[in-house]
Design a protein with these regions (language model features):
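S-adenosyl-L-methionine
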Residues: 58-96, 106-107
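A short, Lys/Arg-enriched interface patch at domain edges and termini
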Residues: 44-62
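Conserved proline-anchored active-site loop of SAM-dependent methyltransferases
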Residues: 82, 97-111, 122-126, 133, ...
């Protein structure tokens, strides 16, 4: 016979959360554990299951998730390289993930497809983008209905009909304020414009109005119902915040993996596209971000930051080397548009900065 102790006691003994103990029990990874009502009982001689990575990888987990919008600076092409730098500390388990510049969420959705974090925080300063995340999470049926109606109306039209429809939708989007009553309509317009505008670009003028012209797509997929439903399910336990990246500070601790993907520092005059919103992310903002990273580094969090490599065009530019001299700076290959028109692309280096 075994002497049994509670999940709370074994959690304290193993220095992990009680919820994580329950997950191990449900997966059958704790030998002879048994459930009594709503409580798990564990033999007091049980051995802690070994996690070889900081987060638990499930080889047979979930359907692949994709970003539901295209976003400037999106990390779709870099996900495989980013994954290599997800920290691994043997049995050290990171249970929380934070992405304060979520954008299109390429790494977020890769992580949601493969890993189980107990708590996830995403944020962005773009209120239209965050509204879309919230609507996908909370009102996906209504959203799919509206996007399906838009797709059925827009795709069969000739060019003149499409132009009228597109610019009418753009005017409506710019005029519509986000409220509880308008959130779904605003999100549907946001996604429609993203799928049909030039180069999938999100750009606003000084008044904060979306001003990208219509793109030339033969048969755009405006409503990807399966992906939207899968993303909605995956977001149910994700905290979504609209605001400055510094708001994530209270969430971040020693058990957190943090990925920061801010607006990149321009490497040329034409590459400096940071008009995701009406505010500018200049060198002073890059310095403020570095100070924030210094703060969260003190918490014991594992940190990964992406940015441009100014030495692509100026080998003497040591801006980031000076700013992050206390960190490990890796250079990774990327293919980027090097002007705002998106018609000049090439292989360049980007920086991946880790603590």
């Amino acid at each position: 016979m075994f002497d049994y102790i509670s999940a709370k006691d074994i959690a304290n003994k193993w220095n992990i959360s009680q919820r994580r103990v329950a997950i191990f029990c449900m997966e059958g990874r704790i030998k002879d554990a048994k459930k009594l009502g709503n409580m798990w009982l564990i033999p007091n001689t049980a051995e802690k299951p070994i996690d070889k990575r900081t987060i638990r990888y499930e080889k047979h987990k979930k359907i692949e998730l994709k970003p539901f919008v295209k976003w400037v600076g999106g990390k779709g092409q870099l996900v495989a390289q980013l994954e290599k730098h997800i920290p691994a500390n043997g049995e050290k388990v990171l249970t929380k993930y934070a992405e304060p510049f979520v954008g299109g969420g390429a790494l977020l959705f890769n992580i949601l497809s493969k890993y189980n974090f107990e708590e996830i925080y995403i944020g962005d300063i773009n209120k239209e983008l965050i509204n879309a995340y919230n609507v996908v999470k909370n009102n996906v049926d209504e959203l799919i209905k509206k996007l399906t109606e838009m797709q059925l109306a827009f795709v069969p039209m000739d060019e003149n009909g499409r132009k009228y429809y597109y610019y009418t939708a753009r005017d409506r989007f710019n005029a519509l304020q986000i409220t509880a009553e308008t959130a779904v309509e605003k999100a549907s317009l946001f996604i429609f414009l993203n799928k049909t505008c030039f180069n999938g670009l999100y750009r606003v003028n000084k008044k904060g109005q979306f001003n990208v012209p219509m793109g030339a797509y033969k048969n755009p997929t405006i409503c990807d119902e399966n992906n939207l439903r899968n993303v909605s399910e995956a977001l149910q336990n994700v905290t979504i915040v609209c605001g400055d990246y510094s708001l994530s500070k209270d969430f971040i601790d020693k058990d957190t993996f943090v990925y920061l993907d801010p607006p990149y520092r321009p490497i040329s005059e034409t590459a400096g596209f940071t008009a995701y919103n009406a505010d500018c992310f200049d060198d002073n903002e890059q310095i403020r971000l570095a100070r924030f990273i210094d703060e969260i580094n003190l918490s014991g969090a594992k940190i990964m930051l992406s940015n441009s490599d100014p030495q692509n065009v100026n080998p003497e530019d040591t801006f980031f080397e000076d700013l992050y001299k206390a960190y490990t700076i890796n250079k990774v290959d990327a293919t980027r548009a090097i002007n705002s028109k998106g018609d000049s692309r090439g292989k360049i280096k980007e920086l991946l900065i880790c603590n």
